[in-house]
């Protein structure tokens, strides 16, 4: 059985928004093949690795990825054919060196990540192992609590709230299967609640409902009603997570809440979150402040860090250097993990390990532009991270990850453990 790379082929495919993205196949001398499709985001952090797009307005409004495809089929293939796919760290180091830029702008983080993931999948297949076991070893056994984005606003919807995501987390369930069922039942009840109030039940990019609502906490009121009407206890069985994506509403040193007609300073924004946490069972707040508001983040943690998981997404961009700085500055206490923010599997695993060693939590996440690729489901189990953020229980691009987790839980049998409330350090 040889795990040496025999061929690497990339192609342009479509993501869940109908935009082009890159798919990569890596074939080994053993005949085993790994395939990966790279996701893309709508609200992207300024410090993310660069997603290479063509910029040719005559194709896909400039969003084509033929340059990234060419980078894989020519530069990367030439460098990696004959390379051992089982040597993941060396392979990723070779890709990073081949690019030679700080943000992967030469070859594109999308090109590099596609090869990085496809190689790992090919190696796992060659060893006859599921991806979670190949990456995580014998101790990979924790099924995550899903962060289910059941109401969308901000960049993921139009004419909705200032804030991007309102999520539920079934922390009181006994298993992932049960937690998923609870979430799905609440999701369907929420649709009825929204419909009965005369609002639209159209969905956003991640499957959550996106009605036009009068205030920013109106979605929380509707979600609380749906939880109770579905027969569950808020704060005990079901808790709430928010991703307001405040970088999107931050300008000239202020947070502009257009739905409420006011602009807030960093300190006022922190007080805003304290008030919401006092009124609703919110356990997790992601990007509660803008990506470079370091002083604000430290204040947020000082005021809420012992009660709420404070997740850095645009703030930390799965980047070890930014994470290390945040740990030292006591800004945030959790990191969102998005493979394509940093652009390689090894760097992603390094960020998760640093967070866990530092007593932080790590939340493995999708992007708003997704596909049928289920890598993140295996990654979250491989790292025992305990939390996954992959949308509403709707749309195949989201459901694919949940279904993969159901399969993994079944395969693990009695060894499987659902993270539940122990997923949190607060």
From Swiss-Prot:
Gene3D superfamilies: Enolase-like C-terminal domain, Enolase-like, N-terminal domain. Optimum temperature is 80 degrees Celsius. GO terms for cellular component: cell surface; extracellular region; phosphopyruvate hydratase complex. Optimum pH is 6.5, thermostable up to 85 degrees Celsius, at 90 degrees it loses about 50% activity. NCBIfam families: eno (TIGR01060). The gene is eno. Belongs to the enolase family. Binds a second Mg(2+) ion via substrate during catalysis. Homodimer. Its cofactor is Mg(2+). Phosphoenolpyruvate binds at residues 41, 165, 313, 338, 367-368, 389. It is found in: Cytoplasm; Secreted; Cell surface. Keywords: Cytoplasm, Glycolysis, Lyase, Magnesium, Metal-binding, Secreted. Catalyzes the reversible conversion of 2-phosphoglycerate (2-PG) into phosphoenolpyruvate (PEP). It is essential for the degradation of carbohydrates via glycolysis. This is Enolase. Mg(2+) 2 binds at residue 43. Pathway: Carbohydrate degradation; glycolysis; pyruvate from D-glyceraldehyde 3-phosphate: step 4/5. (2R)-2-phosphoglycerate binds at residues 165, 206, 338, 367-368. It catalyses: (2R)-2-phosphoglycerate = phosphoenolpyruvate + H2O. CDD domains: enolase (cd03313). GO terms for molecular function: magnesium ion binding; phosphopyruvate hydratase activity. It is an enzyme of class 4 (lyase). GO terms for biological process: glycolytic process. Pfam families: Enolase_C, Enolase_N. The active site is at residues 206, 338. It comes from the Bacteria.
């Amino acid at each position: 059985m040889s795990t040496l790379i025999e061929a690497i082929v990339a192609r342009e495919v479509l993501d869940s928004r109908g935009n082009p993205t890159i798919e990569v196949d890596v074939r080994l001398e053993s005949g085993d093949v790994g395939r990966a499709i790279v996701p893309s985001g709508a609200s992207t952090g300024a410090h993310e690795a660069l997603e290479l797009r063509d910029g040719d307005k005559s194709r896909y409004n400039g969003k084509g990825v033929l340059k990234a495809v060419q980078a894989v089929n020519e530069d990367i293939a030439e460098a990696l054919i004959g390379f051992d796919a089982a040597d993941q760290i060396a392979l990723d180091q070779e890709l990073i060196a081949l690019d030679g830029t700080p943000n992967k702008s030469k070859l594109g983080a999308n090109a590099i990540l596609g090869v990085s993931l496809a190689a790992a999948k090919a190696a796992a297949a060659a060893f006859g192992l599921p991806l979670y076991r190949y990456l995580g070893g014998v101790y990979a056994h924790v099924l995550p609590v899903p962060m289910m984005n059941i109401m969308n606003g901000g960049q993921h919807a139009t004419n909705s709230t200032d804030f991007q995501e309102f999520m539920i987390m079934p922390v009181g369930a006994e298993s992932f299967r049960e937690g998923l069922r609870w979430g799905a039942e609440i999701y369907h009840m929420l649709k009825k609640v929204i419909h009965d109030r005369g609002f639209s039940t159209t969905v956003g990019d991640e499957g959550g409902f996106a009605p036009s609502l009068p205030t920013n906490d109106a979605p929380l009121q509707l979600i609380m009603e749906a939880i109770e009407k579905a027969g569950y206890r808020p704060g005990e069985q079901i808790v709430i997570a928010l991703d307001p994506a405040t970088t999107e509403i931050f300008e000239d040193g202020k947070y502009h809440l257009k739905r409420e007609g006011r602009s807030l300073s960093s300190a006022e924004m922190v007080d805003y979150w304290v008030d919401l946490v006092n009124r609703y069972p919110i356990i997790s707040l992601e990007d509660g402040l803008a990506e470079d508001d370091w002083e604000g983040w430290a204040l947020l943690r000082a005021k809420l860090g012992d009660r709420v998981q404070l997740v850095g997404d645009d703030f930390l961009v799965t980047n070890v250097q930014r994470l290390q700085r945040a740990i030292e500055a006591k800004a945030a206490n959790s990191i969102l993990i998005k493979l394509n923010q940093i652009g390689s599997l090894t760097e992603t695993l390094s960020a998760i390990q640093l967070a866990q060693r530092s007593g932080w939590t790590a939340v493995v996440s999708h992007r708003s532009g997704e596909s049928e690729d289920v890598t993140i489901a295996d990654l979250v189990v491989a790292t025992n991270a305990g939390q996954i953020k992959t949308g509403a229980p709707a749309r195949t691009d989201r459901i694919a990850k949940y279904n993969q987790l159901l399969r993994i839980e079944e395969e693990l049998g009695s060894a499987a453990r659902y993270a539940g409330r122990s997923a949190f350090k607060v």
